[in-house]
From Swiss-Prot:
Cellular localization per UniProt: Peroxisome
Name of the featured protein: Uricase
GO cellular component terms, A-Z: peroxisome
Gene name of the record: UOX
Family: Belongs to the uricase family.
Modification sites for Phosphoserine: 39, 63, 232
Isomerase in keyword set: no
Entry keyword Acetylation: yes
Length: 304
């Protein structure tokens, strides 16, 4: 039978690397009413706090613990007091509240994602209080702030599915004894975009306009001109083009990470049915899938 040593306070064989606790997926719908014209923000927020002491871990002493239920209530109260102008501003408000209210909180991390509601509109007329859920990319942000420093803000896009039926190929790759993939000059190209960028300065930044700009760049570089498209020789090239254009158009951001899971669509062989299928009927395959990633940052000389 194993024997367990209970006097953990004398254990000098381990040390803390990082600690934190908090509340995940705190959901809020905030309604801004300007007469009969209403605006909404629905968000899911996760908060992590790091404390200056470790006595809760070492000794089970909870005297420094801010209950996670209190963290949840604080998120709700800040939505009431501050509103949600942007998810980035809301996350910064949460960080600064805990750092200013509790001297023993030394680090805050807040993740917020926005549920994609869009105001109903018809013939250029916007509805005053009705919205439709439009899953065309989720806006999220991550804000971290230490007691001794300013907030570090990342924003991003996820769950943005895109597909084009031509103007994509894949040729010239390495072939060995295990290669069965044929070269192709024309194929479907589909991906689920994950894109995250870091702001090097946040003063007077319009976070929502920046998000819209980068989302537009993603779509424009993926699709190309509306009348003819733009050829993509590889997922990697499209990924890099998105990053270069984004950093050139948005001077407030310093780096950008993109992940493009390559969603495969394969031509279905109908020859046994006596049919010729010329890339008209394709089979979507969820797994396995290719995953292409890349992170770029501004060169130091370009920041000066």
């Amino acid at each position: 039978m194993a024997h367990y040593h209970n006097d953990y306070k004398k254990n000098d064989e381990v040390e803390f690397v990082r600690t934190g606790y908090g509340k995940d997926m705190v959901k809020v719908l905030h309604i801004q009413r300007d007469g009969k014209y209403h605006s909404i923000k629905e968000v899911a927020t996760s908060v992590q706090l790091t404390l200056s002491s470790k006595k809760d871990y070492l000794h089970g002493d909870n005297s420094d613990i801010i209950p996670t239920d209190t963290i949840k209530n604080t998120v709700h109260a800040l939505a009431k007091f501050k509103g949600i102008k942007s998810i980035e501003a809301f996350a910064v408000n949460i960080c600064q509240h805990f750092l200013s209210s509790f001297n023993h909180v030394i680090r805050t991390q807040v993740y917020v994602e926005e549920i994609p509601w869009k105001r109903l509109e018809k013939n250029g007329v916007k509805h005053v209080h009705a919205f439709i859920h439009t899953p065309t990319g989720t806006h999220f942000c991550e804000v971290e702030q230490l007691r001794s420093g300013p907030p570090v803000i990342h924003s991003g896009i996820k769950d943005l599915k895109v597909l084009k039926t031509t103007q994509s190929g894949f040729e010239g790759f390495i072939k060995d004894q295990f290669t069965t993939l044929p070269e192709v000059k024309d194929r479907c190209f589909a991906a689920q975009v994950y894109c995250k960028w870091r702001y090097h300065q946040c003063r007077d930044v319009d976070f929502e306009a920046t998000w819209d700009t980068i989302r537009d760049v993603v779509l424009e570089k993926f699709a190309g001109p509306y009348d003819k498209g733009e050829y993509s020789p590889s997922v990697q090239k499209t990924l890099y083009d998105i990053q270069v254009v984004s950093l050139s158009q948005v001077p407030e951001i310093d780096d950008m990470e993109i992940s493009l899971p390559n969603i495969h669509y394969f031509n279905i062989d109908m020859s046994k049915m006596g049919l010729i299928n010329k890339e008209e009927v394709l089979l979507p395959l969820d797994n396995p899938y290719g995953k292409i990633t890349g992170t770029v940052k501004r060169k130091l000389s370009s920041r000066l």
